[in-house]
């Protein structure tokens, strides 16, 4: 194993060659479910496609991504491993938040979009099957995951789902920012600063009208969303988004609902992450690849559902295309 990115980036370049082309997604927008399965079987996901149902597609996507992304930290040592681990820990946070929402709404585990992180599917399933969020923290504590400690601390403060998610993100990004500062990886630090901005925008939307104190939820370390803007957006002042012109978030001007915000943030972060291909000697190339695979998983699941339920193209097209 190497302790720098030369070996890892060589492997990542090969794996980027298996990313699905844009033509795949354009074709899939008009296919029946049977034809979608046929098309998917001809890709890198075909090896894990072991059935003809929607859960089989989800399983194939999850397991293929675990193989093509989840093993990246094991291919390197030292600072390189730590940098990659921090990237995948971000997906662990997404997965935990998604499971908390699923448990609260009665959504089945199979419907949860899990992103490739540092934990196996089996661990997330056990966490979902826990009796309550405290039980989920206990499951995550077995492999010594840092989110276990964070979740326990948050649950001592509140049981409200929106607040739990926001406080989890706050604790997570504070810890990750400290770890990233110790690494000589400017591409990673710059990207994580954008993630902090994105999380602040997301949290402000979720907590609008709550009357909660902004300081309890505002994340430090962003580049464009300061505490004042965060507080204003929590109060419903959408002019904050207009003030982000000239930043990577300029496309959010005019957004007024959480779903549109999430879609816009996803595209912004993807675009910024893909700039990492210009960082062949650092973590940037891995960052680009991880986010490209993540976006691929989101698109595949949405397109599978469009085909399975016979939804019109227009209903999902804007969800699977980033300008």
Swiss-Prot record:
UniProt protein name: V-type ATP synthase subunit C
Family (UniProt): Belongs to the V-ATPase V0D/AC39 subunit family.
Gene Ontology cellular-component terms listed: proton-transporting V-type ATPase, V0 domain
Keyword line: ATP synthesis, Hydrogen ion transport, Ion transport, Transport
The keyword Transport belongs to this UniProt entry's keyword annotation: yes
Biological function: Produces ATP from ADP in the presence of a proton gradient across the membrane.
Superkingdom field: Bacteria
Gene Ontology MF annotations: ATP binding; proton-transporting ATP synthase activity, rotational mechanism; proton-transporting ATPase activity, rotational mechanism
Record lineage: Bacteria, Thermotogati, Deinococcota, Deinococci, Thermales
Native organism: Thermus thermophilus (strain ATCC BAA-163 / DSM 7039 / HB27)
Lipid biosynthesis keyword on record: no
Gene Ontology biological-process entries: proton motive force-driven plasma membrane ATP synthesis
